[in-house]
């Protein structure tokens, strides 16, 4: 365990050094762009496009106030969406699938709408030209290139969004050598979100990215992915040893998250904290 503690301390020092130097350089090239987000107030953004992906999931494109603006969201963080339902304010957090570097003048959200879901149903019922209220950025994770040699990711359902955002950022940066192994679980094959985009990322970085898709109920006899849940054995088989320079990122349904956290401890990772911080070896979005 001493080796793990030394590695953890070293990783924290490297993280803060790289975060400092990364921010000194202005991060990416849009440091001159006007950022649309504000933490202290909600701003309205107009829905300009909707693409239905599954029977209950769609990608929504929202226009910023000016076509030269960027959303201003650090990679790995999220926004808060708020509306009034039944006379009461309700809110929920979402991670956009778009990056500031590639989406100037707009941003995109991936939302699965539930009949009983206040915000998700509200967004699902939106018509082109209607507006939502958003504030941010929020969250304790901000991706910085090359802090860890390996990112071990576990995602379920729409929990893929922060993972996809991070992988896109890595793929866009030729100097980023971070390796990614993703276990992505869903109920049915049709529930797999952003599959084409994820497969394209693997094609761009075949030596860095590896994805295993898992289904609870595969409907094809020739399904080539995994079946069932993210088990201890699967994590042990797929991910590097906890003694290596690896950070575990988790996002998905509560039951999946709880199971993965228990498995992580059994594999030698530190116990996940109630509120994850950027430097933690196990980070839960």
From Swiss-Prot:
PROSITE patterns per the UniProt record, alphabetical: FAD_FR
Domain FAD-binding FR-type positions: 40-144
Reactions mediated catalytically: 2 Fe(III)-[cytochrome b5] + NADH = 2 Fe(II)-[cytochrome b5] + NAD(+) + H(+); 2 Fe(3+)-[Dph3] + NADH = 2 Fe(2+)-[Dph3] + NAD(+) + H(+)
Keyword check for RNA-binding: no
Predominant place of localization: mitochondrion
CC cofactor: FAD
Localization, UniProt: Mitochondrion outer membrane
Recorded topology in the membrane: Single-pass membrane protein
The protein's Enzyme Commission number: 1.6.2.2
Keywords: FAD, Flavoprotein, Membrane, Mitochondrion, Mitochondrion outer membrane, NAD, Oxidoreductase, Transferase, Transmembrane, Transmembrane helix
Metabolic or biological pathway, per its Swiss-Prot or TrEMBL entry: Protein modification; peptidyl-diphthamide biosynthesis
PANTHER family linked: NADH-CYTOCHROME B5 REDUCTASE (PTHR19370), NADH-CYTOCHROME B5 REDUCTASE-LIKE (PTHR19370:SF184)
Functional summary from the UniProt entry: NADH-dependent reductase for DPH3 and cytochrome b5. Required for the first step of diphthamide biosynthesis, a post-translational modification of histidine which occurs in elongation factor 2. DPH1 and DPH2 transfer a 3-amino-3-carboxypropyl (ACP) group from S-adenosyl-L-methionine (SAM) to a histidine residue, the reaction is assisted by a reduction system comprising DPH3 and a NADH-dependent reductase, predominantly CBR1. By reducing DPH3, also involved in the formation of the tRNA wobble base modification mcm5s 2U (5-methoxycarbonylmethyl-2-thiouridine), mediated by the elongator complex.
Protein name: NADH-cytochrome b5 reductase 1
Species annotation: Candida glabrata (strain ATCC 2001 / BCRC 20586 / JCM 3761 / NBRC 0622 / NRRL Y-65 / CBS 138)
